[in-house]
Amino acid sequence: LADQKKQNFFSKEELNLILSVYGKGISSGKWKDYAIDSSIKETIFSIYKHASEMPIYRIIKNHKSRRTDERWAIKSTSGQIIKRNKNLSYLLNYFKEKDFRLIN
């Protein structure tokens, strides 16, 4: 077991940034659930509008990318890359542009 490759994941700081944005989506009533998946190639934080649906967003940390600008990505339900960047904070600004007003 000691010879197996270390499983990649989000760092504590990365997860805190993602959960901060996720919390705003939850507070606004736009998002309902999330899931975290990890492999040797990538770690994915999936955001769901309803638990029984496909994720509406996937925040992806690419562990095997040769290009630095492909380290982080946001993908839509269809798998289209919405935004890509080497910096997670900059990438998450995409969600700050979204309207997270509270729903009455």
Regions picked out by a protein language model, each given a short descriptive name:
Residues 30-44, 48-55, 77-78, 90:
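Basic nucleic-acid-binding interfaces
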Residues 1-6, 81-104:
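Mixed-charge, Lys/Arg-enriched low-complexity segments
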Residues 3, 54-81, 97:
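Short aromatic-glycine-(Arg/Gly/Cys) micro-motifs in beta-strand/loop hairpins
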Residues 1-44:
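Negatively charged, low-complexity tracts enriched in Asp/Glu with abundant Ser/Thr
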Residues 16-17, 28, 68, 74-76, ...:
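Intrinsic structural disorder
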